[in-house]
């Protein structure tokens, strides 16, 4: 594990200078501070847990967690990562309170308010992309309650950090895969979760920008929202295929993959299909040859790392070295699944 001493030696500065930068104190030039932060990131530096334990035992932090609903099994995996880290942090006096909500503005605001009433000291949030959520985040931060977003982000808020995918990159990757599979010419249907979830819309943005710039013969026939619901996804995919007989490729930008694939199987058609995530039903369809490729984004790591960042800040007062903490994508096909 990297130490302050290691960072100091590589940066050519004193340990005290490194300590000031990592704890967000003044007295260091911007150029030196940036160099130290880059080295700390490259070494995957984490604050000393023994020191954090002593501080944590005095504070007894309570952290609120708001994730999207159980309709989307991907968030079960994010939650598993959060809960595994929560069990580890219980020894440091940390308690967690979790709420799972639908893609609904009022439901998410209500969940946050419930957690505030419980006296939370920090919030881990998969945000619904709406100005009211941005305002709520800013309200919490102004009250001294730090917020870390996980899996999906929200622009313009005072949230401290984000942990999750680079969704523009994910969309570009999907575009590249579809181009390889179709030789750059196809009629494409898109099923997404919700335009009010930033990660879904950013994936589509990354895909469409790449298609327009590099693969103009791939034409998007229609974009439909299934709200991460398998039954809705089944019905929408049936509708999409019936109304667009020339579609021979599909992109699922969010959940509802299994329902959509069942509709495709019943249609007797065999389009190229690119999806996201490695939930069990998606892997089943991948191994069966229905799905051509799926893009993984390490959900458990997202959950674990985001809670760890919040804990470290609450305990040491040091903000994360990086504001945006991206996990790596990996591509799964039938042969490596």
Give a label for each model feature.
Residues 162-186, 233-234, 282, 298-315:
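Hydrophobic alpha-helical segments within soluble ligand-binding/sensing domains
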Residues 1-53, 57:
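N-terminal helix-turn-helix DNA-binding module of bacterial transcription factors
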Residues 49-106, 110:
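Amphipathic helical "hinge" segments at domain boundaries
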Residues 195, 199, 211, 298-337:
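Hinge/cleft segment of the Venus flytrap/periplasmic-binding protein
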Residues 123-139, 207, 225-282:
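Hydrophobic alpha-helical
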Residues 74-89, 170-174, 198-218, 232, ...:
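Short, solvent-exposed amphipathic alpha-helices that sit
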Residues 129-169, 279-287:
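Flexible loop/hinge segments that line or gate small-molecule binding clefts
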Residues 100, 154-177, 191-194, 288-300:
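Short beta-strand elements at the ligand-binding edges of bilobed clamshell
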């Amino acid at each position: 594990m990297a130490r302050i001493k290691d960072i100091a030696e590589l940066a050519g500065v004193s340990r005290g200078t490194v300590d000031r930068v990592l704890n967000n104190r003044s007295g260091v030039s911007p150029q030196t501070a940036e160099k130290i932060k880059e080295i700390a990131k490259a070494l995957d530096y984490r604050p000393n847990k023994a020191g954090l334990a002593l501080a944590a035992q005095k504070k007894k932090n309570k952290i609120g967690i708001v994730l999207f609903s159980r309709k989307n099994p991907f968030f079960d995996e994010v939650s598993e990562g959060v809960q595994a880290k929560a069990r580890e942090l219980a020894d440091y006096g940390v308690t967690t309170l979790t709420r799972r909500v639908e893609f609904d503005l009022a439901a998410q605001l209500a969940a946050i308010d419930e957690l505030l009433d419980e006296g939370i000291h920090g919030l881990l949030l998969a945000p619904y992309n709406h100005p009211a959520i941005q305002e709520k985040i800013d309200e919490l931060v102004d009250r001294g309650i730090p917020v870390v977003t996980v899996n999906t982000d929200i622009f313009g808020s005072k949230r401290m950090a984000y942990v999750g995918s680079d969704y523009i990159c994910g969309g570009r990757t999907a575009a590249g895969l579809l181009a390889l599979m179709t030789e750059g010419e196809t009629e494409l249907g898109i099923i997404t979760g919700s335009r009010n979830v930033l990660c879904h819309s950013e994936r589509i943005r990354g895909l469409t920008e790449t298609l327009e710039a590099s693969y103009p013969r791939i034409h998007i026939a229609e974009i439909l929202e299934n709200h991460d619901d398998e039954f809705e996804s089944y019905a929408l995919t049936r509708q999409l295929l019936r109304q667009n007989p020339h579609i021979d490729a599909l992109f699922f930008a969010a959940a509802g993959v299994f329902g959509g694939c069942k509709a495709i199987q019943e249609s007797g058609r065999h389009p190229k299909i690119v999806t996201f995530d490695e939930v069990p039903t998606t892997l089943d369809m991948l191994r069966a040859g229905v799905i051509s490729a799926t893009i993984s984004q390490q959900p458990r790591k997202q959950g674990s790392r985001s809670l760890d960042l919040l804990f470290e800040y609450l305990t040491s007062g040091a903000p994360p070295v990086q504001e945006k903490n991206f996990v790596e994508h990996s591509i799964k096909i039938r042969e490596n699944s």
